[in-house]
Amino acid sequence: MSASIPASTFASTPASSTYIGRFAPSPTGPLHLGSLVAAMASYLDARTHHGTWQVRIEDVDGDRNVPGADRHILGSLQRAGMLWDGDATWQSQRGIVYQSAIDYLGEHVYPCGCSRKDIADAQHRLSPKQAQALVYPGTCRHGLPPGRAARALRLRVPQPRHTIAFVDRWYGLVEQDLSDEAGDFVVKRADGFWAYQLAVVADDGAQGITDIVRGADLLDSTPRQIYLQQLLGLRQPRYLHVPVVLNERGEKLSKQTGAAAFDNGASVEQLLATALLPAARWLGMDVRAASIAEFWRAALPAWDRLMLEHRVPGR
C-alpha cells in the first residue's frame, strides 16, 4: 500500500532510546488492587528507564462507562503518588484517529452482518479448537449473504495460517496462529463503538508509545494488535505483561468479581497498608515504607532487581 497515514493523525515513532509508556484504564468504576498492580508496574518501568509515563482513559465503550469514574481514577493515581507526564487523554475524543486507521486499512477491512447467534450457529463447521475459541467462521469474508445488512467491520486475517510471535519481557516467547486462534476480528462494533483492538493500536501509534506494561489478561490480545501495527506501518512496542491479581476463589480480581476500590478516602497509612504495599508484594517486590514518597524511593530499585530476575534474552 503506497498511501501513508497522515502525519497529523499518527505521530512518527520516536527513537528506541526514548522510552514512552502509558497506563490506559477503562472508566467502568474506581481502581482496585488489580488495576493498581498494572498501573504500578507501568509507572515503575517508565521511571526506571528515565522515560515518560502517559495516562489514557479508554472510554471508547460508552455503554460500560460509569459517570465520574475517569476523574476518580485520575485522583486515585495522584493520591498514590503516580503523577503522569503531559495531559491525560480520552479515547472518546479521538474518533478521527480511529477512522483514519480504518481508511488506511482499506480492503483489509470488510463489513460483517453476523449476530452472535449467527456466529454461534456456524461454530459446528469449525474445528474443535476454533469452536472453543469462538473463532469467526468467515461468513461475510467474501461478501454479505443475501438479505443480511452490515453490522460491524472486521479485519481479514491471512488464511490458512498466520503466526505472530513476540518476546514478552516477563513470559518470554509468545506465539499465536491468528487464523486458527483468533480469526477475522472486529475493528468497529455493531453498536457503532470502536473496537478495543483498533483503538488501542491507533492510540499507541499516534502517541509514540514504545513500551506497553499491563496485565497478563491482555497477553492473548497482543498478536492481534501486532498484526494491526504491521498493517498500519507502526513500530512494534516492547511488551511486558505482569501476572493478574486473583481473589480467594482463584478468579481474576475485577469489578465483576467484587473487587473493592483501593482508594476510598483512606488515610496515607491505610493507602500504604491496604494498597501500595500489597500491590508491590504481588509483583514480587519487598518494599518497606512509612510514607508514599518513601515507598516510591524504595520501589524503584526493587523494580530494577525484579526485572533482572525476569530478564529475557534479547530484551
Features from the language model and the residues they span:
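N-terminal Rossmann-like or analogous alpha/beta NTP/dinucleotide-binding catalytic cores
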Residues: 2-6, 10-127, 216-234, 287-294
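Structural motif
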Residues: 31, 191-193, 265-271
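Active-site neighborhoods of enzyme catalytic cores
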Residues: 68-174, 181, 292-299, 303-315
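Catalytic adenosine-cofactor/nucleotide-binding cores of aminoacyl-tRNA synthetases and other
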Residues: 115, 124-125, 220-221, 231-315
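Active-site cores that bind ATP or allylic diphosphates and position pyrophosphate for catalysis
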Residues: 118-264
